[in-house]
């Protein structure tokens, strides 16, 4: 369920969001037919949605007219922050968004009042709840009505993560939806944990603040986390953390929370790699996992062994980036805490993009995980695959898993010209394919030969392209097409 908005928001709202996304991602604009092809809507509906989006922008003073019509194309003229603000204001009137916001501060919501406040009939409201449950039941949650009260049923930790995921995708830091939690106080807590000596983007800090605000809101409304459902190493991890006393004091100055909530908040910082080194060394954390959760420890070390097998010269004790181990450990801790709650809070369809650009990457990692943990639930496996995949690409290219394309460059030019051509070809291909580019003397039969004026008949079965010395735009297009065709033959 890549686009879970479809289960929560109305059809028209989803169309408007998709339309806005298409225009934002195509800065040169799209004509009405191109929009129709991408969104599969007739012209009249598209124009109605475009007009509505501009009306929303005017009403909320996001900007006067974000979508203009020029040179027969519709163009979004706003900035990134204006795009997020506009998207947020399109979504805000949605009834189920309002319902989930009410659950931040309540254990139940009156069904009759909810219908009245959102101008809906009871039958319409029930249909919306039923549709949302198709999504929620996949992670053990459910919206139910008992004695005219709406309840959200499920494990508290899963409910919290689901709310965070939804609110972050809707608000993206443009607004603060937590009416009973002071934004400044939460940001002070975040700043106290994250070292002031390291730059962490506004968005990442805000995302972490959304976690804390959701936890505080739910706890204050009587929806307390169960310590019994936290990972078995939680207490040991927290007890060895020198920040516990400082954090407890800071939070208690502003919020009255049970001890288990303080511990849960501290534990959550571990799922953010940027915060990780503030707490423990890698060795300390691994030692705790090894003692209290052999399964989690083995999962991490098995994946490290998987990397080592693919890259024998790689030194796990001296990775090229300091974030490799934090990314790997935080990924496993995330899965241990939230289990099979797989929601993509970023709004990027990662598995879809990976399947297009490097189709063997995530499936290979998934297979490696399954070889050691064959009974993982589907969503848990999906989440762990993604987290370990993120750690892998901190060190190596995701194209490592794709078939290698052997390219031979043949020219009759001076060596420095030859070098310039090879660099241009490498820059064109390095983020798209797993390839080796050789000049004059190939180590084996090439898949593709790039020639300038040279005619070489030695490799008669290899695909050939004649290119200009400057590697013109048409040459680049032909090279990309040839590489894609070769990959199709290799799969």
Report residues per predicted region.
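A cross-family "folded-core" feature that marks the main globular domain of proteins
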Residues: 2-491
